[in-house]
A protein has these predicted regions:
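N-terminal pre-domain/capping segments
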Residues: 1-92, 117-118, 124, 168, ...
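Active-site-proximal loop/turn and secondary-structure-junction residues that shape catalytic pockets
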Residues: 9-11, 35-37, 61-64, 100-102, ...
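Acidic/histidine-rich catalytic cores of soluble enzymes
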Residues: 17, 21-25, 45, 50, ...
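Short beta-strand segments at enzyme active-site cores
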Residues: 33, 57-58, 92-99, 137-145
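Short, basic/glycine-rich phosphate-binding loops at helix/coil junctions
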Residues: 55, 59, 104-106, 143-145, ...
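Charge-dense, low-complexity intrinsically disordered segments
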Residues: 69, 73, 113-117, 157, ...
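Short alpha-helical linear motifs
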Residues: 101-104, 220
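Surface-exposed cleft-lining segments at the edges of enzyme active sites
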Residues: 105-121, 148-155
Length: 231
């Protein structure tokens, strides 16, 4: 099991590129970040190479949504651009969201007229279309459930079991789930049993404590037992 750190959220007292050096000093194997289209990717690549780190993942979404069938073609085309960047950077994974988030991380367009079943089928169709593209690129798209109670009201994929179900239906080694312990503790709890029962479809795990999304050990979660179960 390798460790990576999201430098959007950690070491924020330093300039962005300097956070890579701080991550190496802290003993991480790799870094993560969110959007790629507003960053100097060659500079990031040079900095991680110099620090001896990898890029574990970054966000695939460039806008658009998986939940509306009329947006599927443009969404898939945008993800192809991200897959190309992942290949250039040597990143094995990219985070994939079902909805478009604004700068404040809220869902921009919720499409309540569609209903949950139509959204589900649209997401399934989009993932099915993305699977061969991800396979060809050698990159894994990790679908991320988020909480709708504290952070992202209106987000479609707010339960882990729906993500597991979708990924199993697509049945591709390059479409997996990102299980974020913070988000799913807020929504459903039962972290250890959920993790250990679905490791076949989980590619990536994010850690933070509840409440507040702070460092492990600052809240209600028993991270010693969670990490023991993962190992």
């Amino acid at each position: 099991m390798k460790s990576s750190v999201c430098i959007e959220l950690v070491f924020t007292e330093y300039p962005f590129l300097e956070r890579i050096e701080r991550a190496a000093e802290a003993g991480f194997d790799a870094i993560e970040f969110w959007n790629w289209d507003n960053k100097d990717l060659p500079a990031i690549k040079a900095a991680v190479d110099k620090a001896g780190l990898g890029i574990a993942a970054f966000q695939a979404n460039l806008g658009g949504t998986l939940v509306h069938p009329d947006h599927q073609d443009s969404f898939v085309a945008s993800i192809q651009k991200s897959l190309d960047k992942a290949q250039e950077l040597g990143a094995p994974s990219m985070f994939l969201l079902t909805d478009e988030l604004g700068d404040d991380r809220s869902v921009r367009f919720q499409f309540p007229e569609l209903g949950e079943e139509k959204k589900y089928q649209s997401v399934l169709g989009g993932l099915t279309a993305l699977a061969p593209l991800a396979e060809e690129a050698g990159v894994t798209l990790v679908l991320e459930p988020l909480n709708t109670r504290a952070d992202h009201p209106g987000y479609f994929l707010n339960r882990s079991h729906i993500g597991f179900e979708l990924v199993r239906a697509v049945d591709s080694p390059h479409i997996k789930v990102l299980y974020d312990i913070y988000h799913m503790q807020v929504m459903e709890g039962n972290v250890i049993e959920t993790l250990t029962g679905n490791l076949d479809v989980i590619q990536h795990v994010h850690v933070a404590d509840v409440p507040g999304r702070h460092e492990p050990g600052t809240g209600e979660l028993n991270y010693a037992n969670i990490l023991k179960a993962l190992r």
